Amino acid sequence: MVRLFWNTHNQINNNTNNKKNAADHLWGIYHKENSNLWIKEILKGVEYSITESEKNIENGDVLIIVDSSIEKKIEQYKKLKLICSKIFLFHLGDESALHDLTDVYKNFDYVWRTFCHNKYFNSKLVQCIPVGYKSGVSDKKIASKKYKWAFIGTPHKSSRHDLLFQLSSIKENFCHKTEQFNKKIISVDTMSEVLSSTEFLPCPNGFVHPETYRVYEALECGCIPIVENAYKYYDRLFPNNPFIKIDKWSEAKDLVKDWTGDQIIKKQKECKIWWDKYKIEIQNFIGKKIN
């Protein structure tokens, strides 16, 4: 039997007096709440049952583990490897890639991980996948777009402040700024409504890594992502992608202000076709690896 086991919220040594362990526990809960529908979508090519406990895993099962803070769990993986006929990992988080995970990953038949780094781009054991969209974000299919651009997030870096400075004069726009990650956020339904009503979504780099949820939420909701071209990250992750890429936000200002309706509609369609095709390709690849 193929079983799916979410393990992100089950943290080893969950001592809340230890700040690192407490943070890992909170991140594990966050991943389960916010990435479950993305993982479900990319696993469409696999028939599986969900197990809530490793106690339900039986000898000979094919196991798919979704996990984070994996550097702490190598003994658990070694034990499961002895029981299962095959074992696969979806590794969430790990933006900074601080740990050498060679000894962890070798317990698995194959690994998919978010937040790609140089050593994983050409790996035979590991494939990088998008961080995906937040669970519940969906296209409201609003034809007439109310906003030229939108920003939803924390302006924690100079690049983000420059983004807001450059684009603030362009109306109409929607701007929801938070002081801290995941604090005073808008609901996913409101976000879906806003993004589905927006033409362009500037997607600045994340705090540690270039990738963020916003790129994929833009694609899900039919608006055009504008990404920073740092290290040509998105071209390495997605060759021939249709994203608009800029080196500085003043370039985005001219583009958002000057693009005509036909240009916008053409790029929206291009992004939608590419994203739908990409998701089918990753579903097929995962299905072939696991089945």
Model regions and ranges:
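Acidic, PIN/NYN-like endoribonuclease modules and their adjacent C-terminal/linker elements
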Residues: 240-259
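Nucleotide-sugar donor-binding catalytic core of glycosyltransferases
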Residues: 1-245, 274-290
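Conserved donor-nucleotide binding/catalytic region of nucleotide-linked donor-dependent transferases
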Residues: 254-274
